[in-house]
Every structure is written in structure tokens, then in C-alpha cells.
């Protein structure tokens, strides 16, 4: 059971997890863990499932998925009949009015839909992942000199579950450098998996780029792959002018994570998100929603 904080109701909700029985069996049973290490965490498994989700045969999964997880299709640019395969649906675009962007340059917005954790006063040797599990920031980005620039800074971890809108966006005007890709495995990023696999983010496939934002300094913008995420697709053009809310990219099928790192004294995260993170709870947010401000 995954409990998270709902800002609208000021109360806790229970997340409806896609494939929850499978996740619990895989990460909690000896047989499941053996299968995970031998096959499921490997690129080959995710490529096979990604191949299926790219084929017309997978179209029959769409209606059931929409009904099971009560996805509001009125927010989407396309109707169900427009999608050629499940990945077309999974990477669906939303109408512009579905995710309004705060124009105020001092307002920090969420880069995507999902559940967010926030940690300030970053310790580079011990970044909290979830459920008290820690990892090294040095190991995560594999660049010691760059990592040192973010000592005592702020980290935001946005977890996208399979039922979420899976495109991620820029949080400010600016320019973004080329993407750096780090190979790894394809563990699930669900809290069930995070509690079982130490330093999971450092073991999974991930990509990052330096985003030179106009109002929040140089931000490390990272995407972490997960089980069945066949691809992390970057749609932005490096080193060109970017505007707040512009699309950066999207994930194909699977749960995924976006991580942002800010330098010291650049942002102030909203108190409710910080307080819930201290208690060990994620907060539900949508793309474009204010989550903090310029310091």
C-alpha cells in the first residue's frame, strides 16, 4: 500500500498501483527476486515489452487501462480511436489548457505529473531516495567536479507511475546542454522496489543535462528509466532558447522518475511538500503546478 499526500484535500490518499500484485511478488519473494536479477532488470526484457507496446496488437489494452485507472480523456489532444498502439496512448499529449503554466518568473513549477519528494541541505554522500534509503550523488551522476557544485543544495524527486501523463517539461526560461547518458538496469522505481534495492537510482539507466535557467541557476535535470521503459525520448533542441513549460521529452511505457538538483540558495520549496517529505510521504502534483519559489 502506497499512501501519499493530496494538497487539494489536505489529506492522504492510497495510490492505485498498476501491476501491484506483480510488483509485490517480484520484489518480495525469493523466486521473484531471482527472476528479477536474471531477466526482468535487463534491457532485453524492457525491449521485448516495448516492442509489444509499439505494435497495433497492444491497442486492446487501452480501454481497460483507461477504465481501471479512471483516466480523464477529455484532457487529451486525441481520442482513444486515434492511437495506433498502447505507447501512442501512454505518451499522449494533453491540451494546453489542461496544464496551465504560472507566468510569474519567481514561481517554481513541477516538471511533470506524479508524486514528489523534496530534500534541502543536500549531503552529496547521502541523498535520501525514499523510505529512508540513501545513495551517493557522486555515484548518481558519475561526475565528481559537477557534483560538488550542488553541495548543500536542494533535490526534487518526481515519480511518475504508469497511470500518469508521461511527458516532462522545463521549469523556466533558459537553455539546456546536450544530454549525457549513463547505462544501467531497469528496476521498477515504485516505492515497493525502492525499499528493496539499495541505491536503485544509481543502478538504473539514466540521462541528465545541465539546464541554464534564467531564474533558478544551473539545474541538473535527470530522467531515470524503469522496468518496461523502452526509451527515454528527448524532444528538446540543445543550446537553443527554451521557454517555461516547453516539453523536454517523454518516457515510453513504464513508471519513471525525474530528478532535479538545484544549487544552494536558489529556490525555496513549498512548506507542505518539505514537511510531507520529512514524514516520508510523497505529495501529488501535476505539471505546471507551483511547488516553490525563487530564493
Swiss-Prot record:
**Site note Cleavage (non-hydrolytic), residues:** 255-256
Q: In which pathway does it act?
A: Phospholipid metabolism; phosphatidylethanolamine biosynthesis; phosphatidylethanolamine from CDP-diacylglycerol: step 2/2
Task: Tell me which InterPro entries the record gives.
Answer: PS_Dcarbxylase, PSD-B, PSD_type2_pro
Q: Which reaction does it catalyse?
A: a 1,2-diacyl-sn-glycero-3-phospho-L-serine + H(+) = a 1,2-diacyl-sn-glycero-3-phosphoethanolamine + CO2
Location in the cell reads: Cell membrane
The biological processes this protein is annotated with in GO are: phosphatidylethanolamine biosynthetic process
Q: Which cofactor does it need?
A: pyruvate
Q: Taking the first listed entry, what is the main subcellular location of this protein, grouped into a coarse class? A: membrane
List UniProt keywords, sorted A-Z: Cell membrane, Decarboxylase, Lipid biosynthesis, Lipid metabolism, Lyase, Membrane, Phospholipid biosynthesis, Phospholipid metabolism, Pyruvate, Zymogen
Q: Please give the GO cellular component terms listed in this UniProt entry.
A: plasma membrane
Modifications after synthesis and translation: Is synthesized initially as an inactive proenzyme. Formation of the active enzyme involves a self-maturation process in which the active site pyruvoyl group is generated from an internal serine residue via an autocatalytic post-translational modification. Two non-identical subunits are generated from the proenzyme in this reaction, and the pyruvate is formed at the N-terminus of the alpha chain, which is derived from the carboxyl end of the proenzyme.
Any binding details for the cofactor? Binds 1 pyruvoyl group covalently per subunit.
| Membrane topology (UniProt) | Peripheral membrane protein
Q: Which residues carry this modification: Pyruvic acid (Ser)?
A: 256
- A single Gene Ontology molecular function, please? phosphatidylserine decarboxylase activity
Q: Could you tell me which Pfam families the record lists for this protein?
A: PS_Dcarbxylase
- The record places the active site at 113, 169, 256
Enzyme Commission number: 4.1.1.65
Record function comment: Catalyzes the formation of phosphatidylethanolamine (PtdEtn) from phosphatidylserine (PtdSer).
Enumerate the PANTHER family for this protein.
Answer: PHOSPHATIDYLSERINE DECARBOXYLASE (PTHR10067), PHOSPHATIDYLSERINE DECARBOXYLASE PROENZYME 2 (PTHR10067:SF17)
**HAMAP family from the xrefs?**
PS_decarb_PSD_B_type2 (MF_00663)
| Subunit structure, as described in the record | Heterodimer of a large membrane-associated beta subunit and a small pyruvoyl-containing alpha subunit.
Q: Which family is this sequence assigned to?
A: Belongs to the phosphatidylserine decarboxylase family. PSD-B subfamily. Prokaryotic type II sub-subfamily.
Please report the name of this protein according to its UniProt entry: Phosphatidylserine decarboxylase proenzyme
Q: Look up and give the organism this protein is from.
A: Clostridium botulinum (strain Kyoto / Type A2)
Query: Gene symbol?
Result: psd
Amino acid at each position: 500500500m502506497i499512501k501519499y499526500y493530496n494538497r487539494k484535500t489536505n489529506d492522504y490518499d492510497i495510490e492505485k498501483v498498476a501491476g501491484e500484485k506483480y510488483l509485490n511478488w517480484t520484489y518480495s519473494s525469493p523466486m521473484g527476486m531471482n527472476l528479477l536479477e536474471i531477466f526482468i532488470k535487463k534491457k532485453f526484457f524492457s525491449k521485448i515489452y516495448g516492442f509489444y507496446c509499439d505494435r497495433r496488437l497492444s491497442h486492446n489494452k487501452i480501454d481497460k487501462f483507461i477504465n481501471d485507472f479512471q483516466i480523464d480523456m477529455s484532457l487529451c489532444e486525441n481520442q482513444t480511436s486515434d492511437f495506433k498502439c498502447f505507447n501512442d496512448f501512454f505518451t499522449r499529449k494533453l491540451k494546453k489548457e489542461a496544464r496551465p503554466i504560472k507566468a510569474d518568473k519567481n514561481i517554481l513549477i513541477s516538471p511533470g505529473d506524479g508524486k514528489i519528494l523534496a530534500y534541502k541541505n543536500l549531503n552529496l554522500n547521502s541523498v535520501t531516495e525514499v523510505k529512508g534509503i540513501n545513495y551517493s550523488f557522486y555515484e548518481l551522476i558519475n561526475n565528481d567536479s559537477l557534483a560538488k557544485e550542488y553541495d548543500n543544495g536542494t533535490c526534487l524527486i518526481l515519480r511518475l507511475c504508469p497511470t500518469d501523463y508521461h511527458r516532462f517539461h522545463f521549469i523556466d526560461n533558459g537553455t539546456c546542454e546536450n544530454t549525457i547518458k549513463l547505462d544501467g538496469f531497469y528496476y521498477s522505481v515504485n516505492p515497493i522496489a525502492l525499499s528493496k534495492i539499495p541505491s536503485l537510482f544509481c543502478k538504473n539507466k539514466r540521462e541528465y543535462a545541465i539546464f541554464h535557467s534564467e531564474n533558478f541557476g544551473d539545474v541538473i535535470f535527470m530522467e531515470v528509466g524503469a522496468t518496461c521503459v523502452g526509451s527515454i525520448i528527448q524532444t528538446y533542441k540543445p543550446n537553443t532558447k527554451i521557454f517555461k513549460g516547453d516539453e523536454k521529452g517523454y518516457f515510453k511505457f513504464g513508471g519513471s522518475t525525474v530528478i532535479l538538483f538545484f544549487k544552494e540558495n536558489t529556490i525555496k520549496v513549498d512548506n507542505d511538500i518539505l514537511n510531507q517529505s520529512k514524514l516520508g510521504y510523497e505529495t501529488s502534483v501535476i505539471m505546471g503546478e507551483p511547488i516553490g519559489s525563487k530564493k
